[in-house]
Amino acid sequence: MPSPGGVRAQVVPLRAGCLDRLHPRAAAGVFWELDPLVAGGGELSPEIDKEAWLVSLAYRQDTVGFSIVDAAGDADAQDALATVLYCPGADAPGAVRMPTAPVSEDAWLVTSLHIDAAVQDRGWESVLLDSVIAASTSAGVPALEVFGLRREAAGETISAACGELVASAAEIGLVEVSILESAGFKVHVDHPAIPRLRLRLPPQFDLLTAREIADLLAEVPAG
């Protein structure tokens, strides 16, 4: 049931001057941002590395991602309940680790989507993905790609390295394939555990309406 006071969560764009409303795992994770083939990467703290990457990216694209925050919470609280980040494929060198890499030359990459367990599977993932789709379409991006997760299929058919990626899915920010497909993405390069999905832009379907988004964000679970 929506809360009587109306929408209690809201989507905020992440752009230059407003990059601090991040999910904690998004703020600390540098899996995508650091090149694993370059020696000396990650010598600073992960938070400093991530902040530097976001600031650099924000000077080149209008929004680098979106977060969902508790609108009724403490105005000074910086942590978001969920965060999605995206960028040109060349700005995510860590993607080389993925078994279905590289990203197509014409595509931007949805690198990560981090979300609190208490608000998973409530449609918030779709709200964030739709926000990225809309912003990317407005920016003239030809296509979006994303590495999806098939956790239930991961087993003896995958390599040890791929198994480590699956085990680290929450830290990396991988999204279940079923959620990505419900947002309009289709498998582009298949894999038992980590396929690469693609969505050509503009999308040939309607995005969530403002009312639908408001209904999905109308209640923030306690705790």
Predicted segments — roles?
Residues 1-63, 80, 84, 145-223:
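Terminal substrate-recognition subdomain of acyl/acetyltransferases
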Residues 56-60, 73-116, 160-163, 167, ...:
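Conserved acyl-donor/pantetheine-binding loop and adjacent beta-alpha core of acyl/acetyltransferases
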Residues 63, 138-141:
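Short, high-confidence coil segments that cap the C-terminus of an alpha-helix
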Residues 67-75, 186:
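Core beta-strand residues in small-molecule sensory/regulatory alpha/beta domains
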Residues 70, 88, 199-201:
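Residue-level signal for short segments within beta-strands and strand-turn junctions
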Residues 89-91, 118, 151, 204:
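Short coil/turn motifs at secondary-structure junctions
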Residues 109, 128-132, 184:
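Short, hydrophobic/aromatic alpha-helical segments in well-folded domains
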Residues 115, 121-137:
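Conserved acetyl-CoA-binding loop-helix of GNAT-fold acetyltransferases
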